[in-house]
Amino acid sequence: MVQGGGLLGRCLQSVELPAGWLVQCGGGWEGWSPRDWEPRLQGWKVHVSATPECAVETLARTTRVCVEFGVSFKFLPTLAGLTEASSKNQARGAAGKFITIYPDDDGQLGELLSVLAGVLRGQEGPYILSDLRYVPDAPVFVRYGAFLGMQMPDVDDELVESIVDPRDMRLVPDHRDPRVVIPDGVEVPEFLRPAYEASQQSCVSRLDDFVSIKPLSFSNAGGVYRAELPDGEVRILREARPHAGLDGRNRCALQRQLVEEEVLRDLVGVKGVQQLRGVFTAWEHRYLEVDYIPGVTLASWRVQNIHLQESDPVEYARQAVAIVDQLIVIVEAIHRRGWAFGDLHPGNVLVSDDGTVTMLDLEDASRVDSPREPGVRVFQYCADKSADAVQADWFAVARCIMMLYFADFEIEAVSPAFWDRCRHRVREVYGERAAEQLISVEGRYGVGVRPVTASDVTVGVPSRRLSVDSGIAGLLSGIEWSRQFGPDGAFPGYITQMAAGVHEVITTGRAGVVLAQQRIGVVPADGDVDALRKTAKQWPGQEAPGLLNGLAGVALTLSEVDAQRDDAQRDAVAAAGRALESAVGRRRLDLAAGQAGVILAALEVAKTVGDSGLMDRAVAAYRR
């Protein structure tokens, strides 16, 4: 196999495709199957996980077994795909799956598992939370689920993956939760009984010492919990899953936690840093036990005090300056101990009710004299590569300060002069102390340092305030400019642009632009109106009928086109009627995408166009 495309794009498959086998690619996966393979609808399927370090070898060994058995399988073909599958923000119910194998029957499943357990013994990979682990010393997992894509609408009319209930042949959701779920009516084969029983067992650990444990947040790296001891003392438990929760440097949660433990031990006694109280392992997950600090994040503090910021900017600035004073002192103390914080942003700064500041989450810290390698970051607070680790911390502190006063500072990524404008406004609105504090921090990193999100294409800041008219003109010009990046002459509005008509609807497409133009007195382009008419006529019956995400919104937009466009208004009536018909079969009742929005759109179209028939149908739908 050719291996190229850079490190992340490197092909992980080192085995040649056998004669008589087919390859299919889609959704980030590469599938290999015998030419005569006849897939089942559902059954027990095998998942294999891997770390980036052993992925090539794990895939090669698994491929040889699958070819020997003549069994179909799919895999993530690149290191980038594998890293994403095990990343910190990946859905926990699906994370970690590197290879999926589709046995022909349970007999083959048992033989396959036995062989894989042997050839993959000692290989490493994250635990797949949705699955049974076949043996403890190999990354081989099993889950009952769909082999072929079958979908059914959920309570919000969103299509979800499904399987057939073997008891009554009805479609039921194919649950992919971060826990083992055996569908009703499915028997666990005898050779999977030990794995199933092991999944139901608990182990004695430090966790048993706490009278209550409440989750505060979850990620694929592990959870963060509030835990109370019998004497009433409260701790925070930070969980780390081995080989899971990869960051931009391919470090797993456990590797980052080991760094954080080292940092916290070095920072014992530093005021303003969350203190370490212990470390323990429960089952295969490792926990840091740290002090519980009541309070809110710096970002939340800012939101909670917006009323004060608007009503009394002087008092707001006094409190903000006091918070920043503490933040500066804490960062200086961390640097004196030889560490750079790393992932410094408002979410990792805690403010207590009395204004005391505490810094949290040092898993991305590094030695001040080591090369800077960003791992997990909130990018608008992250300096570009020109900054060293210490300078990057001060760059982030400056952005934390500016966030307290002007949260839209992030525009600096495309307009460097906007930062200067914000600094000037800090002095003008919040006083000398706030401005000098910011300027002092800015002096601690290089003049040319920019955010990592900075664009090569930059725009200036208007020398005077925009009028409403000039602002609207600028927006319209920018919207028109963006058309070059949209499909079929539409406007880019949704990152995937996958669903039918998504680039034509109100929320994410052309209808939203045309509707806004009409309501401010700008005549939309004939080409856009004609495109919406075409969309209305060709809208697939199975697609969303909703006001903001579907056909009803297109109809509403067409109804407001200049009355001289009778063709558009006729199409609006027809589209609103079809949206009503489609909505009857939907479960959702909300305004955005449900029956309420469709009915209101139909009423508005009927009123605007003067169509009594549509009005009667809309009223009848409302009464239902």
Regions inferred by a protein language model and the residue ranges of each:
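ATP-binding glycine-rich phosphate-binding loop
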Residues: 11-30, 190-230
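ATP-binding glycine-rich loop module of kinase domains
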Residues: 41-52, 214, 220-260
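Structural motif at the C-terminus of the N-lobe alphaC helix and the adjacent alphaC-beta4 loop
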Residues: 262-272
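Juxta-kinase regulatory segment immediately upstream of eukaryotic protein kinase catalytic domains
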Residues: 1-7, 155-214
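Short beta-strand micro-motifs within the conserved protein kinase catalytic domain, predominantly
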Residues: 275-286
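Catalytic-loop of the protein kinase fold
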Residues: 335-346, 351
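C-lobe/activation-segment region of protein kinase-like
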Residues: 364-432
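Conserved short submotifs of the Hanks-type protein kinase catalytic core
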Residues: 284-297
